[in-house]
Amino acid sequence: MGFSHGVSKTLKSPKSLSLLRSYYSKFNPYPSIFGLNDHRFGLIKHDYCSNTRKENINPIDLSKYPTERIRNFSIIAHVDHGKSTLADRLLELTGTIKRGHGQPQYLDKLQVERERGITVKAQTATMFHKYNFHGPNIGDAHEPPTFLLNLIDTPGHVDFSYEVSRSLAACQGALLVVDAAQGVQAQTVANFYLAFESNLTVIPVINKIDQPTADPDRVKAQLKSMFDLEPSDCLLTSAKTGQGLEQVLPAVIERIPSPPGYSNSPLRMLLLDSYYDEYKGVICHVAVVDGMLRKGDKISSAATGHSYEILDVGFMHPELTPTGILLTGQVGYVVSGMRSTKEARVGDTLYHSRTSVEPLPGFKPAKHMVFSGLYPADGSDFDALNHAIERLTCNDASVSVTKESSSALGLGFRCGFLGLLHMDVFHQRLEQEYGAHVISTVPTVPYIFEYSDGSKVQVQNPAALPSNPKKRVTASWEPTVVATIIIPSEYVGPVITLCSERRGQQLEYSFIDSQRAFMKYRLPLREIVVDFYNELKSITSGYASFDYEDSEYQEAELVKLDILLNGQPVDAMATIVHNLKAQRVGRELVDKLKKFIDRQMFEITIQAAIGSKVVARETISAMRKNVLAKCYGGDVTRKRKLLEKQKEGKKRMKRVGSVDIPQEAFHELLKVS
């Protein structure tokens, strides 16, 4: 409806329609496809409301683009190396968006992305570009053919590495963008190997050559030494000024192979991503690997087994553009009446319901690596928080949510996230979009404990692990990551010290060039989950670049650390730590709590304990009313009697009184590693 409505406003006259024709003729050498009587795809005629004119709208004929004329590629880069600006320039070069459109980072800031935050993790855009693949034409007898280019824009962050790998599976090539001044960074390394493992053709693009500190020759040498990419293959560009951009699209067409699918095989589509639209429901980004898809087809999901009818199909040019059909090798969107994005699993295979096909390889369900409890700051706001989380998870299927209760914080939710960035953005959106003020508990990672009877249990919430279990814990395991760190060589010493303190194991250590060092460490995920990146930036004056990927579980001596207030454990503050660090972490926790818990009319004892063994203790003295103020001398026994009475009252208060824990205390506990 949105597309039809937009057309009804713009096409007020035949003159406007002719402008649309001339606009598309820039991309398409086949003007016949814009004829008014083309009934092949069922999108010719739209009926509008009484105050608008009836117009005939014709889609682009996708059958004119066999797989030989299709190129699917992605742009991968480290943060701030110019990926989004380069994507903007390519969209402008092909006429997909107008120059000076007033919206920089167009693919990062489509309406759905601006409104949905992290939900639209992969965005696609279809472009048309005329290019003579076999050298210049002699005379004007033949017009150069038009190629259909699908840009699949992916995030660079490690939290979404699975989504990125699925998006790359739909590509045959990638532009590896590197800053001419900063050179190869940690995410450059991670992204290159993701593309390399997917067997993609990698085209190195050295961007920002207009900067005064740019040194393209040094970057070429780095790319050669680290990835064995030939210096002669590198493209030198400046997305900001437009310098060198004219060589990017020809390189994409010449170097990247066409999609390898079979048009006469049964339909197989790879689901790249999805988002929720209030009017259309779930909109899925898909890549057609084999076969073809038409509007009205019945499709099934290999992951869930559910069946759907295709209500709308098309591509992003750059907004939703209905075509009624998608052919082999093409990338676009489908609307199938899904109610929730939880039904749209990233990496899933979609196929015609009447056929049986082999699912595409590589599908994995979402793997949650960080868990945190979310509670309303005001206990009475549980229903409002419940509504906010339901609305948010309707759009972001990668968050797991289960209800839980805490004796200290009341009713709340235990949420699982893909990583730290995912968790931070989720919290931020809850507050910004829904005004939900939440208390979040210390983030934890999934541990595995084995008991003396041989049973194993995965623990996502430390409070669920008994402090004095009836069965003895015989072994425990924690998840680890392989971290890539690139730093200036003068900071090598402090970084090695930091990684050693965080129980890191060095895997690799080399120099990229005379100025920068490359290091790989295996680190427990628990050690980097809170403040490792901040510490790393601090000791390297902000020059470090850091990236990580999930690794296997490793055995570790883990213990549950309880926080007790006046002898009562606070379940929301329990945490699981390594035995060697338990005393230090316990001391830090009780010191923080002493600063943030207000004095009461009775004494408060704060303890950190492992089972029944107390490892750290602090006491907050009681506020004391001067009960002797009214005694002006006289018998000392009168004063003693008043003091004894006060002492008894304090004891009774301590026994029945509750300690109020401010929200700031929970936020401060997040910073204790």
Swiss-Prot record:
Annotated positions binding GTP: 77-84, 153-157, 207-210
GO biological process, alphabetically ordered: positive regulation of translation; translation
Family: Belongs to the TRAFAC class translation factor GTPase superfamily. Classic translation factor GTPase family. LepA subfamily.
GO molecular-function terms, A-Z: GTP binding; GTPase activity; mitochondrial ribosome binding
Record-level GO cellular component terms: mitochondrial inner membrane; mitochondrial matrix; mitochondrion
Cysteines engaged in disulfide bonds, as pairs: none
Topology in the lipid bilayer: Peripheral membrane protein
Reaction(s) the record says it catalyses: GTP + H2O = GDP + phosphate + H(+)
InterPro entries per record: EF-4 (IPR006297), EFG_III/V (IPR035647), EFG_V-like (IPR000640), G_TR_CS (IPR031157), LepA_C_sf (IPR038363), LepA_CTD (IPR013842), LepA_IV (IPR035654), P-loop_NTPase (IPR027417)
EC number from the UniProt entry: 3.6.5.-
Keyword annotations: GTP-binding, Hydrolase, Membrane, Mitochondrion, Mitochondrion inner membrane, Nucleotide-binding, Protein biosynthesis
Subcellular location: Mitochondrion inner membrane
Miscellaneous field: This protein may be expected to contain an N-terminal transit peptide but none has been predicted.
Broad EC category: hydrolase
Organism: Ricinus communis
Any one Pfam family match given in the protein's UniProt record, by short name: LepA_C
Official protein name in the record: Translation factor GUF1 homolog, mitochondrial
Chain's role: Promotes mitochondrial protein synthesis. May act as a fidelity factor of the translation reaction, by catalyzing a one-codon backward translocation of tRNAs on improperly translocated ribosomes. Binds to mitochondrial ribosomes in a GTP-dependent manner.
Location, primary (coarse class): mitochondrion
tr-type G domain location: 68-260
